[in-house]
């Protein structure tokens, strides 16, 4: 028969158990608010698209350490001068993150500040006014700190505004002519700064008056327009675009139309003369039907050189995740040189 424990001994064991339980709960809770590594696909699957080289993916938590909700992230922008990543949500939140890389791989992300987007009178944007979808940074790579500006496009009430890094609007909102004919919730998702044509925007889906499967890219000064052929996957839509180092554009498309698989397409587009159709070539077609573990990728930003980040919008759904993924676009000639026999 086992020896009977004294009341003092039982109390001590109970305290030990409670302490261990508390520590474990704290560790589990901490894991739930820190980004974790995530695997999009096997090395064999990734190797099927040699023009895309992956450099790390993180699964972001549903909230930061201070309980600020993380979700609905629709676009991101990299500030090279400040080494900061900005992320906007379709509920009017602006997050600022510090990223960590190890040997070129994305391994961490730490939240620094979160602000609400606010109008020129410092009143927070709410409801349909807060539906931020596109983000592009200005003066973020000029070797001067403290002068960055954020250009943000909104969808439900279509317009473009300029903001300070604190989320305060510093310009009157305006709606460019190129946004005409866009259906509700299919507006200006994509923004980029073109070296020749200035700030460009792209509509998510086919606007009224254009052929099915085509959408519009246009300059915000209303001077230039191009037609853009969407990928052939059912429901494919343009969600983001960024400049490539050689002057072409990197396009991010998402096709989500159940019962078809979720498909994320990374494409290269070349703009010819205004008024013409963009020349487009698919670099990678990532499909959940082929074993890729994807989510609703719709945000994109240029890091430096040929490296980019893309982010997914979890729609604040418990069935989805917010993924932040790093990749490089390998130039065809570079790939040919690397794969040539010795």
Language-model segment annotations:
Residues 17-27:
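Bacterial N-terminal signal peptides
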Residues 26-342:
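Sequence/structural signature of beta-propeller domains
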Residues 1-11:
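N-terminal secretory signal peptides that target proteins for export/translocation
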């Amino acid at each position: 028969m086992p020896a009977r424990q004294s009341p003092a001994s039982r109390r001590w064991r109970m305290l030990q158990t409670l302490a261990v339980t508390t520590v474990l709960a704290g560790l589990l809770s901490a894991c739930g608010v820190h980004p974790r590594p995530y695997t999009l696909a096997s090395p064999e699957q990734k190797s099927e698209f040699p023009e895309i080289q992956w450099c790390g993916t993180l699964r972001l938590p549903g909230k930061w350490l201070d309980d600020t909700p993380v979700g609905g992230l629709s676009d991101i922008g990299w500030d090279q001068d400040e080494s900061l990543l900005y992320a906007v949500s379709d509920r009017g939140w602006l997050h600022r993150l510090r990223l960590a890389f190890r040997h070129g791989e994305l391994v961490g992300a730490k939240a620094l500040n979160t602000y609400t987007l606010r109008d020129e009178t410092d009143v927070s944007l709410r409801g349909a006014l807060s539906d931020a979808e596109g983000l592009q940074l200005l003066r973020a790579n000029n070797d001067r700190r403290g002068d960055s500006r954020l250009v943000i496009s909104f969808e439900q009430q279509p317009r473009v505004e300029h903001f300070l890094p604190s989320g305060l609007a510093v310009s009157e909102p305006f709606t460019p002519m190129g946004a005409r004919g866009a259906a509700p919730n299919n507006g200006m998702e994509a923004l980029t700064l073109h070296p020749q044509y200035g700030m460009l925007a792209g509509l998510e889906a086919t606007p009224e008056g254009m052929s099915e499967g085509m959408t519009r890219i246009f300059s915000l000064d209303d001077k230039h327009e191009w037609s853009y052929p969407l990928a052939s996957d059912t429901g494919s839509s343009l969600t983001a675009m960024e400049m490539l180092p050689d002057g072409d554009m990197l396009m991010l498309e998402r096709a989500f139309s159940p019962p078809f698989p979720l498909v994320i397409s990374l494409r290269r587009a070349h703009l010819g003369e205004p008024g013409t159709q963009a020349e487009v070539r698919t670099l990678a077609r990532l499909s959940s039907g082929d074993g890729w573990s994807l989510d609703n990728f719709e945000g994109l930003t240029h890091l430096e050189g040929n490296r980019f980040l893309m982010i997914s919008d979890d729609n604040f759904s418990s069935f989805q995740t917010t993924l932040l993924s790093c990749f490089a676009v390998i130039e065809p000639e570079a790939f040919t040189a690397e794969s040539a026999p010795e």
